[in-house]
């Protein structure tokens, strides 16, 4: 059987892991043997990443172990205090938030949290929020405006929760209200897609002065599976839909939908959470610095102009 580049990458990763485990178990210094292998591994990861298809990137965004919003908060924030409830129906663990210090700067966080293991993923519905989640986000944006706190949102969802109960409680209305409230923020708003950015569920907390995306994340009006089910009546056509939708970070930057692509460690953010967090933290902080010079009226005008300028049409 012919070996593929992916096979070679997995084989080298296994060799490095085995040597690292041996060094830890025996106390031997194997740095001399590990150094060239790690260099080769980084090179292979970069070459592999360069050849990934759009569907490959979608799969990478869903990789088990990819950093969640709270993984970044743990590494980048201090004084994080989660606030609960929408003051109407209840709390939603899929969309959380509250005040914190982002690398020392006071901010209001809005976070779509998928969960870190099977139990918490089920509890948080894999990051798919109910209406009370979006209404909680509106409440937190009200507080951000009142206290002059910049808003930082980390987006990671395939879409809003599609259940009957969510529709009965006004899912579409809640998303629309959240978008409207974010447009009217009089404080800086920086949004970053850190994994999946699907449909209105992502856009509800994605109306920022700056929108960023990590290198292996995706962002689209619908998930590839959803588009395939509608267009071809077959979710198995998701790879084809991903190509048609142009969902990747590079596509979005090319179309002007995001301002910047945040680089990830070779192979993906899940392989080095600390490095991924450092890159994300510094990029968001830089954009917050840039926006801090604008007046509230300037922020409103810039945000409105940004979203009105998206898209293109051709007159015939």
UniProtKB/Swiss-Prot annotation:
Keywords: ATP-binding, Cytoplasm, Fatty acid biosynthesis, Fatty acid metabolism, Lipid biosynthesis, Lipid metabolism, Nucleotide-binding, Transferase. Residues 36-290 form the CoA carboxyltransferase C-terminal domain. It catalyses: N(6)-carboxybiotinyl-L-lysyl-[protein] + acetyl-CoA = N(6)-biotinyl-L-lysyl-[protein] + malonyl-CoA. Pfam families: ACCA. GO terms for cellular component: acetyl-CoA carboxylase complex. The keyword Lipid biosynthesis applies. PROSITE patterns: COA_CT_CTER. It is found in: Cytoplasm. The keyword Lipid biosynthesis applies. Disulfide bonds: none annotated. Pathway: Lipid metabolism; malonyl-CoA biosynthesis; malonyl-CoA from acetyl-CoA: step 1/1. GO terms for biological process: fatty acid biosynthetic process; malonyl-CoA biosynthetic process. Its EC number is 2.1.3.15. GO terms for molecular function: acetyl-CoA carboxylase activity; ATP binding; carboxyl- or carbamoyltransferase activity. Its main location: cytoplasm. PANTHER family: ACETYL-COENZYME A CARBOXYLASE CARBOXYL TRANSFERASE SUBUNIT ALPHA, ACETYL-COENZYME A CARBOXYLASE CARBOXYL TRANSFERASE SUBUNIT ALPHA, CHLOROPLASTIC. Acetyl-CoA carboxylase is a heterohexamer composed of biotin carboxyl carrier protein (AccB), biotin carboxylase (AccC) and two subunits each of ACCase subunit alpha (AccA) and ACCase subunit beta (AccD). Belongs to the AccA family. Component of the acetyl coenzyme A carboxylase (ACC) complex. First, biotin carboxylase catalyzes the carboxylation of biotin on its carrier protein (BCCP) and then the CO(2) group is transferred by the carboxyltransferase to acetyl-CoA to form malonyl-CoA. This is Acetyl-coenzyme A carboxylase carboxyl transferase subunit alpha. The gene is accA.
């Amino acid at each position: 059987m012919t070996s593929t580049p992916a096979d070679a990458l997995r084989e080298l990763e296994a060799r490095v892991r085995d040597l690292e485990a041996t060094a830890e178990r025996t106390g031997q210094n194997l740095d001399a043997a590990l150094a060239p292998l790690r260099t080769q591994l980084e090179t292979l990861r970069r070459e592999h990443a360069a050849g990934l298809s759009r569907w490959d990137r979608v799969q990478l965004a869903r990789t088990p172990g990819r950093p969640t919003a709270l993984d970044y908060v743990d590494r980048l924030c201090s004084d994080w205090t989660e606030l609960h409830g929408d003051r109407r129906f209840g709390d939603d663990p899929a969309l959380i938030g509250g005040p914190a210090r982002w690398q020392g700067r006071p901010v209001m966080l809005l976070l779509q949290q998928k969960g870190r293991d099977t139990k918490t993923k089920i509890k948080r519905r894999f990051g798919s929020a109910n209406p009370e989640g979006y209404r909680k986000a509106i409440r937190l944006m009200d507080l951000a405006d009142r206290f002059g706190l910049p808003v930082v949102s980390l987006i990671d969802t395939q879409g809003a929760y599609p259940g009957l109960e969510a529709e009965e409680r006004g899912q579409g209305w809640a998303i629309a209200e959240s978008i409207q409230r974010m447009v009217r923020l009089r404080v800086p708003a920086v949004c970053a897609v850190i994994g999946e950015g699907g449909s209105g569920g992502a856009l509800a907390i994605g109306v920022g002065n700056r929108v960023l995306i990590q290198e292996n994340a995706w962002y689209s009006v619908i998930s590839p599976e959803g588009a395939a089910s509608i267009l071809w009546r077959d979710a198995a056509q998701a790879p084809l839909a991903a190509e048609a939708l142009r969902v990747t970070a590079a596509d979005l930057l090319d179309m002007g939908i995001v301002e910047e692509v945040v680089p990830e460690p070779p192979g993906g953010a899940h392989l080095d959470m600390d490095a991924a967090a450092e890159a994300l933290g510094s990029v968001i902080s830089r954009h917050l610095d840039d926006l801090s010079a604008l007046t509230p009226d300037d922020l409103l005008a810039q945000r409105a102009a940004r979203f009105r300028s998206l898209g293109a049409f051709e007159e015939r």
